[in-house]
Amino acid sequence: MRARGIERNCQNWWKWGIMLLGILMTCSAADNLWVTVYYGVPVWKEATTTLFCASDAKSYETEAHNIWATHACVPTDPNPQEIALENVTENFNMWKNNMVEQMHEDIISLWDQSLKPCVKLTPLCVTLNCSDELRNNGTMGNNVTTEEKGMKNCSFNVTTVLKDKKQQVYALFYRLDIVPIDNDSSTNSTNYRLINCNTSAITQACPKVSFEPIPIHYCAPAGFAILKCRDKKFNGTGPCTNVSTVQCTHGIRPVVSTQLLLNGSLAEEEVIIRSENLTNNAKNIIAHLNESVKITCARPYQNTRQRTPIGLGQSLYTTRSRSIIGQAHCNISRAQWSKTLQQVARKLGTLLNKTIIKFKPSSGGDPEITTHSFNCGGEFFYCNTSGLFNSTWNISAWNNITESNNSTNTNITLQCRIKQIIKMVAGRKAIYAPPIERNILCSSNITGLLLTRDGGINNSTNETFRPGGGDMRDNWRSELYKYKVVQIEPLGVAPTRAKRRVVEREKRAIGLGAMFLGFLGAAGSTMGARSVTLTVQARQLMSGIVQQQNNLLRAIEAQQHLLQLTVWGIKQLQARILAVERYLKDQQLLGIWGCSGKHICTTNVPWNSSWSNRSLNEIWQNMTWMEWEREIDNYTGLIYSLIEESQTQQEKNEKELLELDKWASLWNWFSITQWLWYIKIFIMIIGGLIGLRIVFAVLSLVNRVRQGYSPLSFQTLLPAPRGPDRPEGTEEEGGERGRDRSVRLLNGFSALIWDDLRSLCLFSYHRLRDLILIAVRIVELLGRRGWDILKYLWNLLQYWSQELRNSASSLFDAIAIAVAEGTDRVIEIIQRACRAVLNIPRRIRQGLERSLL
């Protein structure tokens, strides 16, 4: 009875133990997530990289000496692709855009490079003896205009072919290009110098150099992309919800101008006001127009250019006569300009909450700031814009209160002056533009305004704006405001339930060597350490390649005048090398992780919930790759290092597993090193057997003591042998040999070893048999219970299937009955209606008969 109770309790324990084990296995299986590497995920990060140019220069200008050197650009894509990004919101900031800085540096480099072969005018930094030029008849009549008085006839000494000889030459200079050395203005003759001599070097533009802007497309190299904001009312800063990706920007004309933006793009709907901080009067304001205003500029023909030698092989091209000079001007439609100013004023008043918007001329400064400066046909015009910016607008009444010009004139004429010494974009150098011997006529479109705000009392209803400019970055911002460069990150990690099948250390113990010898030390540990070194070397090799390419680029930039590479050629080389570096870097990481050639690569790195505790469904069903990348961005480096360590350990395990094949060679069995291993293993086996024997003896003794057995003395004597006259089993009592008699003890080492091995094998056999019987019983019980459960579920399924069929049949019958009854009622109603209609004549006849009676 006691044995049955124990057996019954054991059965209950086994039952509950199996249930608990199943629950634990289910929970562990549900929680086990592993890191999986994905290559080609749509993830990007803000970056700064070298952009290269694309242009159709040949379709615009056949002159090969254009200052923008766009012939070195790659051809534009005839079918540019623009891919819209759905459900993507990206932040843009036109005021902190590296594309603007890069374009600014490119324009400076292009100016420097195009003027390198031209004549340096350093010898002209001498004293100029200047006076007002007289007409050919020797008199200066009253009909000399103010612009004509703006020129000086200057004489100066230059070096001849013989360096110790000086020669006096004459040339005409614009008054804006020279400054007096002394303050003596009482006489007509004073000493002057060129305006640039104390600030920057000067170079005369080559005769064949042209300044006609050609559209430039900035393109991102492989591994990078350009994001474009397509919101029609985007002001340049903040989030943009309508985002697309392009490889190149639209064609941007590098027009260098102040106050007015020329030949740019237009706003699509309404005038857009852009400023880094509109309330800060120190920040410039860019007004992006939605309709262009045409401006036409001209300068009549003059055959007045002369060649003045200034040294060995050098010449200065100057004006010989000013017969009709000074008639440069520009015309703008008054109606178009008034309409444009009205829209700009309305937008400014709305943003600043002001009712009176005033436009006034520039408050002062360099000619480049106080006038509208630009290049027209090779000459640099400086036009007075006081006629454009001299009006007041009442926002509440939507009308123009005052306007300086006479409204009867259809055009606004801007008087322009021409300068020949022009500060370059960066202000570090100057250029001397020789006079052009032809009629100059150019037409441009005003697409934007550069404004500054006076500031003052905040609670005032008035606000004054003046034309500004001077920082060419604002010109480039007006076109690049909707672009930003991002770096594509194709490598992504995310948790999945898939685990890489690897060679684990526990499984390596059941190898070929273990089958023969039982225990094997960790072989090839040195090879494993070397594998780690190889990983480090691979990374250093990649770093060396990148460093080498950077050194090459620096050398090319330093020697580009010897290699005859243009600025665009350098950028194309940088872009191509950068693309190779990006590809090699990604492939190197995939190779280190053991994922070469795979787009989805599982690992055996467990996912840590501290990186992200979101559920698997929440990650894969509700999050985009960009959102997921932002969430785990702080742990990406750690995850990468864990994947690398895991792959390194995997390679080490594989190497050790392959090293087990050396036991297949019988020749190695006779090696003295292997024999030492055999002896060591034999000693370990003998020691293990002795230890097991001692443990079993102690356990047996303890068990007998618990049952009341007293151990014998250690001085137990051997039983005395029987005599020949008393053979065994022939004593008086007869029968079997007494149980209390001692048996013969074993003598000899081999006999003891054999007896211990026999006892150990029997013990192991009995225990193993009991374990197998218990396992068979458990499997039998589980099978029986499982079969019963399956039969129960089958019966339950059949029952509910029958119930569903009965319910469906009942429902169908009820619907059929209801439809039949309804149909009968409808038919009956129709019949009654028809009878009523048919009985109408009869009722009329009966009524007439009754009335006649």
Swiss-Prot record:
It holds the Pfam family GP41. This is Envelope glycoprotein gp160. It comes from Human immunodeficiency virus type 1 group M subtype D (isolate ELI). GO terms for biological process: clathrin-dependent endocytosis of virus by host cell; fusion of virus membrane with host endosome membrane; fusion of virus membrane with host plasma membrane; positive regulation of plasma membrane raft polarization; positive regulation of receptor clustering; viral protein processing; virion attachment to host cell. Residues 297-329 are annotated as: V3. Belongs to the HIV-1 env protein family. Residues 630-664 form a coiled coil. Residues 130-153 are annotated as: V1. Residues 383-416 are annotated as: V4. Glycans are attached at residues 87, 129, 137, 143, 153, 157, 183, 188, 198, 235, 242, 263, 277, 290, 331, 353, 384, 390, 394, 400, 405-406, 411, 445, 458-459, 462, 608, 613, 622, 634. Residues 571-589 are annotated as: Immunosuppression. Residues 509-529 are annotated as: Fusion peptide. Residues 723-738 have a biased composition (Basic and acidic residues). Residues 659-680 are annotated as: MPER. Residues 457-468, 460-468 are annotated as: V5. A motif (YXXL motif) lies at residues 709-712. Residues 703-853 are cytoplasmic. Disulfide bonds join 53-73, 118-206, 125-197, 130-154, 219-248, 229-240, 297-330, 376-442, 383-416, 595-601. Residues 362-372 are annotated as: CD4-binding loop. Residues 154-197 are annotated as: V2. The record marks 508-509 as: Cleavage. The chain crosses the membrane at residues 682-702.
